[in-house]
Structures are given as C-alpha cells and as structure tokens.
Amino acid sequence: MKDKLIKAALSLAVVCGLGACTKNYLDINKNPYEVDKDQMEAKDYAIASGLSAMFGTVVSTDVNTAQFTDCLLGGTQGGYYADANNGWTNTISKYNPTDNWTNVFMYSDKVIPQLYSNMSNVEGISEDPLVMAILKIVKVCVLNRVTDTYGPIPYSEIGSTGKIQVAYDDQPEVYSQMFDELDEAIALLDENIDRSITSTTDQVFDGTAVKWCRFANSMKLRLAMRVVYTDFVSSKGLSPQQLGEQAVAHSVGVMQSNADNAQLSSLAFGKDGNPLYTACMYNSPAGSVTGGDSHAAADIICYMNGYEDPRREKYFSKAQFSGDNALEYVGMRRGIAIPALSTVGLLYSGVNFVDGMATPLQWMNAAEVAFLKAEAVGVFGWNMGGSAKTFYEQGVRLSFEQWGVAGVDEYLVGTTLPESYTDPNGGATSYSTQLSQLGVAWNDGASKEEMQERIIIQKWIANFHLGNEAWADFRRTGFPHLIPAMESAVGNNSQGIRNLTLGARRMSYPADEATNNPENYAKAVEMLGGSDNMATRMWWDCNPAVK
C-alpha cells in the first residue's frame, strides 16, 4: 500500500510538471475513500433521522400508539389517568378490553418494527461508539416496557425488520440480556466519556456521553430493583443487589440532578405535539377546559389533596363542579360505568401538561433515582452511599424543583393523610376506605413495610405521566394502595381477575399470535406459568406480601 501511494504521488508530480494540472483537478483527483462535506452531512442526517425514529419508540411519539400504551394502559393501571370517553364499553380499567387495546406494544409498527429497522439502518452507516451505546440503551428502554407488559417476549431472535413471529425468551433471560446490553453501553461510554456527538443528532441529551452514561446506570438500578424479590443472577454472576450497587458506585454514577433527567425534546414531535397531551385532549367537548378521552384519576388526586401537595396545579386542571367542589381538584374513579363526557365527564379535573403540546416526553427523572436508592437502603440494606431518609427527602426536593413549585420544607414535615374519595356525581362511585395511614414526614423508626410504602407513594407522585413505571411498582410492592374498579362495572368478563384490589398483573398476548406463531406462543404461555390473561403474574411479580 505504501509503494502504491508513493507511485501515485510520483505520477501526479510528473503530470503536473509536464504541464498545468487540469482545472477540475479537485474533482478528478479526489480520494475515492474520503468522505466530503456533502456526504458527511448526508450521513449525519441519516444517523440523526434513525436515532430520532428510535427515540420515538420509548414513549411513542405516535399519538394513537401512545394513547393505548401510556394513557389507556399505563396511565390507568398506574393510577394517574381515568378513561373519560363514555363511548368505550370495553376498557383495560374494567378488565374487558378488546385485543386491539392490549396488543399494541407487540403489534404496533410504531414500536418494535420501528425500533429494529432504524437500529439496523444506523448500525449500517455508523461505527461511532457513542452512537452504538445509545442504540443499546434505547433498545433496553423500549423492550423493558414490552416485557413488563406481557412477561416472556421475542427478544434475542428478532431480526432487523422487527418481525416478532419468532421464538420468545423467558423473562429472566430477557432481563439478563438487558443488563448485558446496558453494561456494554456503559463500557463504550466509559471509553469515550469526554466525547460528544452533534447535539442536533441527539434530542435527549444533546450528544453528551456523560449524561447517557448516568442514564444507563440509572436504568440498571431501576431494573435491579424490579427483580429484587426474585433469585435472579446475571450472566456475570451478579445478584440484584450487586447490580444496583455497581450502578451507583460507577465513576460517573446515576442521575443526581434534574439536569440529568432523560426526556425527549419537543423538537422530535410531529405536528400533533406531545402525544400524551394530544391523546388526553382527543374528543374534548366544545368549551371543555379539562380535556377529553383521559382525565385525572381519583387515586392520585386523593393522595395529593390529603397531602396538600403544591404540585397539583402543575399536574391537573381544576374541576368544574359547582357548590362545595367548585374549583377544587376532583379526579374520576377508574373502572366505572363512564359518565357522559359532554355533560358530566368534562366537570372532573383534567390532566395538565405544563408546556401544552411542546411539553417534553419524560423517560426517567433524578427524583425516581433518589427514591430507588431510598428503597434500596431502607428496605433491602443495599449500600447506596447514604441513608434512606436522605435519599427520600432528596427525591421529594428534586421533584419540587423539577416542577418549579415552592414549599418543600413544609411538605416534608407534613403528617396529614390522603383523603377518601367522594364523587360529586353521586355516592355510588365514591370510595370511603382510607387509602393510606401514612403522612409525608419520614419516620426512622418505621417498619420496612412502612418505609417502602412511604417511599413508593412519593416516587409515584414524582413520576406523574410515567404510568407504566407506576404500574410496575404497584405490582412489585403493592403500593400505593389504589381505588379498585367497581364490581358492577367489571361484570363477568374480568380476564381471570377475581381480586379487584390486586388489579391487572399483565396484558394478554395479541390474539393473532396463537394462529400466526402457534408453537412459539404455546412455549411462551408455558414459560409464563399460568393462563394467558390479565390475572397471571409474571416472573418478577413475586413479592410474598402482595396477595
């Protein structure tokens, strides 16, 4: 190769010495292996486009997809949103959904196919280790939500097109692979920690390697806590405790401040804006100031009203009832016969988005990480580098800061309790049972169960809009206590659910899997260890106290 380059240089010298070089010298003599400015810009655009499409699969930027996955599923089962469209007779909240309500995570072309096809495209044009790390992290973020919805899922056998009619992986194996991919991403980021990619390529962290590394470690801590009640051992022989401690002890560590929050910029949205905002506003009656298809759930408002939580004005619009409930925060009960939206439903508090259509899509926040550390220390005795009280109060402070509200010092010493639910529309849907006996103020002498409940309640409030994460915590810990669906609304078509307090533990697989992928579907149900319905618990849902 060296001889060829020397000969090429000599030939060029001879040609130029014999006469003037051609005026098109720069074009004719361009190195065919060198990328010019136009090609580089095209490559950068292709990478940015692929990453943006992948980012849009974590919390989907497609409004219809996001409505099913994060409003009608996560939003309701997490106790944040209530279904308000009285045209819906079959809902997840009533445990009688149709297949097109529950198959979205696996069958929508806006989730797995969009993730894998764009991941394959980016891998084909970039060898940048930062980009490769981002691909791995985003893949874990997406498929974590999928496996936590169904249990065993296709993972290792999915190809570049995202086709899911392949063999399923058992859920422990899915988690093992997710931890491995996070570790691979962290290793790549470690080697390039002072580098960045073009900020316009990255609509989450502006191309900053350090922030992606903190996010990866934070995800690792989140997943370690998810499997805490299992006997899980990673491919490297690590227990959940060791995985969590490893994430926190890493040189870059986990999220520490709101500057570390993982959220997708509104620059990534299409004309419809924030998909959750648009989905909540669908079918708003004329003149409504509270929204349409989704309204605020009674569950979270009962807690926040009782705690006199100043974040309410950021989370909800005020109810439009008259009399004693005028201009107060009043949520709608989930799992009921939905009242007419145009006359009654529009009177309940709506779901608020601080910047409307331009509100960023939250993936994970520093407050959640602080609460993860508080639970790890207080309940399970992990070494997180501080006390449970310190991390608990840090989580509350971070959330108040994130939402831009004052009064955190007074809030942290509060002893008031969540209020019971009185429905202004009539007593039949009211709920008089006390949801919790705990105030906000920390108690060092509390039992581990009480510590866990207090931590999860505040984590739940801080994670508003992240309904799928709230639902996962509810299944894992039993907290917060939520208002159950009404027996009269659920009827007999309850997807195997007999205990309304426990609620839905998973979603059924897409109905077509039984015919389009029968052998692999049968094996998936066998790995699940129970019937393919909403009552069967998945592998990590094994806390003996939740029964």
Predicted ranges, named:
Residues 22-32, 84-92, 148-157, 412-432:
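Short, compositionally biased low-complexity segments
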Residues 21-79, 125, 492-547:
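Membrane-proximal, proline-rich intrinsically disordered regions
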Residues 62-71, 152-153, 467-472:
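Beta-strand acidic-aromatic groove motif in beta-rich domains, primarily in extracellular
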Residues 1-30:
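Bacterial Sec-dependent N-terminal signal peptides
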Residues 400-547:
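C-terminal functional modules
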Residues 24-26, 102, 480:
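Extracellular glycan-recognition regions
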Residues 81-407, 444-453, 458:
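Structured, solvent-exposed acidic/aromatic patches
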Residues 14, 18, 63-64, 321, ...:
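Intrinsically disordered or highly flexible coil/loop and linker segments, enriched in small
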